[in-house]
């Protein structure tokens, strides 16, 4: 989705207005949905959320166009050695914007769409070139919303839902890389 990374509250509010009055904001170094907010034009807390998220203009914050398909869930796709090996559909709880499982989202095994395969095919070589053997990417509708290399969760859920144990794939890639 259309994205802005800024520490300027004025820029972030202007970006929100340009995106139809609603955006998702999140810290660049966050994990598990911490610090993720749906900020709307009529929200009386919008400025306070942005002040907190930017530490009063000293820390970068990412703002993304709000994608309504989030209500249907986003996909966490695990790429091992640059190849997609498993995918989860993460569906947010009824009164929640975040689909993260530990905040009440629920998981289901998912197949990749043609667009998701295209995203993986374009991203895989870049990850391999940079020596990134494991990444979790989040896809919402047709949009890549996140590339997570610090906490790419989903292994346990994929296995519990019958999608196989991906740990062996990861170990094979690590051994083959000589890392």
Ranges and model annotations:
Residues 4, 78-79, 138:
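Well-ordered beta-strand positions
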Residues 15, 33, 72, 145, ...:
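Active-site-proximal flexible loops/turns
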Residues 1, 22-25, 155-160:
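Short, structured secondary-structure boundary patches
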Residues 111-179:
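ATP-dependent carboxylate activation and anion-phosphoryl transfer catalytic cores
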Residues 2, 35, 97-99, 145, ...:
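Glycine-rich, flexible loop/turn motifs
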Residues 9-10, 17-24, 28-119, 123:
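Phosphate-binding site of ATP-dependent enzymes
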Residues 1-5, 11-14:
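Anion-binding alpha/beta catalytic cores of soluble intermediary-metabolism enzymes, centered on
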